[in-house]
Amino acid sequence: MNMERKDAIRSAYRITGGNNFYDGMITCSTLSGKAVCRLVWGMNKAECDAYLEKALSGIPEDFSGKLLEVPVGTGILTMPVYKTMPKANITCLDYSPDMMGQAQEKASHLNLNNITFHQGDVGALPYADGTFDIVLSLNGFHAFPDKDAAYREVFRVLKPGGTFCGCFYVTGEHKRTDWFVRHIYEKAGFFTPPYETASGLKNRLEKMYTAVTLGTVKGIAWFVCRKEVKPKSDSLDQAESEDKEK
């Protein structure tokens, strides 16, 4: 990501504010948010920015195709990015109308006219096969109750040759994070087991996609991968079958 785009995104973040607790935590930008990032995730602001930049690296800076973001959450992570993508056709979906409402407000504040918002379930996406050039998922898969359905639906709506990129929590990378997830976040209903490990996620993605790039920053895995132009018809079924045998 070049400096011009970074400056544009940073400027947009100032417009959206992000001064509530959730936005401050997810961006590690407020005093309370930085405290949570350090305590729960063992991360500082630079590390939070690093995994997000890697997760977004699958989106070309001149992107003008169709992009699906699921879940969009409050939009604090992506509305500023979308401000730099005026030619893109963007669809944002979230199961929570409250979260999505906050994203819509941010889009309105930034005068974004190329975004459509839908309330819905990632396990049953209301889109035709091969609709999107890119599917982006930031910090969502660890919360999805039916992760197999989510993987299947993302694969289905992505065009052959399209990019799937994003990030989410993986277990086994940071002990303190694992403890908080198990004892606090699960009980609060924010996270839903089972969780991927970094190696398990890489294996899963490599069975479904090609050109898989994956890394971790503490307990967060980021990834970028591409759906084959002519994918094997049984690639998804094979991946699911092997996962069930484990």
Regions found by a protein language model. Name each.
Residues 16, 25, 35-41, 165-223:
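C-terminal alpha-helical "lid/dimerization" subdomain adjacent to the S-adenosyl-L-methionine
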Residues 66-124:
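Class I SAM-dependent methyltransferase SAM/SAH-binding core
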Residues 207-246:
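Core SAM-dependent methyltransferase catalytic element
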Residues 2-61, 80, 182:
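Conserved class I S-adenosyl-L-methionine
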Residues 134-146:
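A short SAM/SAH-binding and catalytic strip from SAM-dependent methyltransferases
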Residues 123-134:
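A short acidic, Gly/Pro-enriched loop at the edge of an enzyme's catalytic core
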Residues 148-160:
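A short glycine-rich, Lys/Arg-flanked "PGG" loop and its adjoining helix->strand segment in the class I
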Residues 66, 161-163:
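Short glycine-centered segments of the SAM/dcSAM-binding site in methyltransferase folds
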